[in-house]
């Protein structure tokens, strides 16, 4: 009798994806983040579902419903902080996952990479709308500032903003629709993640050397299931430590003040994971230019396959490209720091230089360095 997992139509899909999947024998812990992102998504959907049972998307009661969750609902504080800090863990895993893809040339799997870029946009949209829901000061003003950016679009801009708001300002209609979108998007993300995996399994995984590994494959289970469990344990350790010891470490104190349209906070800023893009937006004095730079700072990832000039796929054996990669990482950390600072003298110019360097590295320096490395190898 043939094995049940290999014959049953549903089990066969799971078997070919997680059990008998041929995987390269040399993939490192940098390949753990896909499964960790899946875990983050499950945590977010479950905690979000339980939060939605007690939350009300009305401007009059949204803030107090979140207070009610934290004070009166059994373990409501735990669910709320797991959800808030789970988003931070999600983005940490996302950035590391994308960074891994850039370093090892995984972007040459075009369909997988493009679905990944789409997933990144979807997760960012979901996180932004989720941040608006508690209806604190930073929720309200963050929503006002970011949605207002669309007014920079020529001709249709102002109409588009009012259409998204559902009125002439961020109000009840905006909050209700943001809640609806915030609820539905994670399920769309889950479906997209399935498509992401589908395309990945068409080609098989990349590996640190960037060399095809068809001659040397091992089954996913038990080798990488065990390896993934280590990552899972570390993720849970970090998340529970954050939630139980300093749940507000990554949040903004302003969001503990109910939204007040008549009182603008001194420094409007998004959550930490958007600060790099926010710094790029602020570094350009022109509104439309800033919005374009903001979108391009993420969309530039879709250009990566076309900017790949190296003869080798991975950066493993390309020390000069490695050097530029780590400069890019340092640049993004600098932008993240700048995004959280007020708009005054030293910070403005640092932000502008860091923004120029970001685009310069990706569009000019890295492709040229790759060509130089090709010549050094006499290829």
UniProtKB/Swiss-Prot annotation:
Family annotation (PROSITE patterns): CYTB_CTER, CYTB_NTER
Subcellular localization(s) per the UniProt record: Mitochondrion inner membrane
Recorded GO MF terms: metal ion binding; ubiquinol-cytochrome-c reductase activity
Record's cofactor remark: Binds 2 heme b groups non-covalently.
Main subcellular localisation: mitochondrion
Binding residue positions for heme b b566: 97, 196
Binding site for heme b b562: 83, 182
Keywords: Electron transport, Heme, Iron, Membrane, Metal-binding, Mitochondrion, Mitochondrion inner membrane, Respiratory chain, Transmembrane, Transmembrane helix, Transport, Ubiquinone
GO BP field: mitochondrial electron transport, ubiquinol to cytochrome c
GO CC terms, sorted: mitochondrial inner membrane; respiratory chain complex III
Lineage: superkingdom: Eukaryota
Required cofactor names: heme b
Record membrane topology: Multi-pass membrane protein
Regions crossing the membrane: 33-53, 77-98, 113-133, 178-198, 226-246, 288-308, 320-340, 347-367
Entry binding sites for a ubiquinone: 201
PANTHER family hit by this protein: CYTOCHROME B
Summary of the function given for this chain in its UniProt record: Component of the ubiquinol-cytochrome c reductase complex (complex III or cytochrome b-c1 complex) that is part of the mitochondrial respiratory chain. The b-c1 complex mediates electron transfer from ubiquinol to cytochrome c. Contributes to the generation of a proton gradient across the mitochondrial membrane that is then used for ATP synthesis.
Note: Heme 1 (or BL or b562) is low-potential and absorbs at about 562 nm, and heme 2 (or BH or b566) is high-potential and absorbs at about 566 nm.
Subunit structure: The cytochrome bc1 complex contains 11 subunits: 3 respiratory subunits (MT-CYB, CYC1 and UQCRFS1), 2 core proteins (UQCRC1 and UQCRC2) and 6 low-molecular weight proteins (UQCRH/QCR6, UQCRB/QCR7, UQCRQ/QCR8, UQCR10/QCR9, UQCR11/QCR10 and a cleavage product of UQCRFS1). This cytochrome bc1 complex then forms a dimer.
Similarity comment text for this entry: Belongs to the cytochrome b family.
Protein name listed in UniProt: Cytochrome b
Organism from which the protein derives: Neomys fodiens
Taxon lineage: Eukaryota, Metazoa, Chordata, Craniata, Vertebrata
């Amino acid at each position: 009798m043939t094995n049940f997992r290999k014959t049953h139509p549903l089990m066969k899909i799971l078997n070919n994806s997680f059990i008998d999947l041929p995987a390269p024998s040399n993939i490192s812990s940098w390949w753990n983040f896909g499964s960790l992102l899946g875990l983050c998504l499950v945590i977010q959907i479950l905690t979000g579902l339980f939060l939605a049972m007690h939350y009300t998307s009305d401007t009059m009661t949204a803030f107090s419903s979140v207070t009610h969750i934290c004070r009166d609902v059994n373990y409501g504080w735990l669910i709320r902080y797991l959800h808030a800090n789970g988003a931070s863990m999600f983005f940490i895993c996302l950035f590391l996952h994308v960074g891994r893809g850039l370093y090892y040339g995984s972007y040459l799997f075009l369909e997988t990479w493009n679905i990944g870029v789409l997933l990144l946009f979807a997760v960012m949209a979901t996180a932004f709308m989720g941040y608006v829901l508690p209806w604190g000061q930073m929720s309200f003003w963050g929503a006002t500032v970011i949605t207002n950016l669309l007014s920079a679009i020529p001709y249709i801009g102002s109409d588009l903003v009012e259409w998204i708001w559902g009125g002439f300002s961020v109000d009840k209609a905006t909050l209700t629709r943001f809640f609806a979108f915030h609820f539905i998007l994670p399920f769309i993300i889950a479906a997209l993640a399935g498509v992401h995996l589908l395309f990945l399994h068409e080609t098989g995984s990349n590996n640190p050397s960037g060399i095809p590994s068809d001659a040397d494959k091992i089954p996913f289970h038990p080798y990488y299931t065990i390896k993934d469990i280590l990552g899972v344990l570390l993720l849970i350790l970090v998340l529970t430590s954050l939630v139980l010891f300093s749940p507000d470490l990554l949040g903004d104190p302003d969001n503990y003040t109910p939204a007040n349209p008549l009182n603008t906070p001194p420094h409007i800023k998004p959550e930490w994971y958007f600060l790099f893009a926010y710094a790029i937006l602020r570094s350009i004095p022109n509104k439309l230019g800033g919005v374009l730079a903001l979108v391009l700072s993420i969309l530039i990832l879709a250009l990566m396959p076309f900017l790949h000039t190296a003869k080798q796929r991975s950066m493993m054996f390309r020390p000069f490209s490695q050097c530029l990669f780590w400069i890019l990482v340092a640049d993004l950390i600098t932008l993240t720091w700048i995004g959280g600072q007020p708009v005054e003298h030293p910070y403005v110019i640092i932000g502008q230089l860091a923004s120029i360097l970001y685009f310069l590295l990706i569009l000019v320096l890295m492709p040229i360095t790759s060509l130089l490395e090709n010549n050094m190898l006499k290829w």
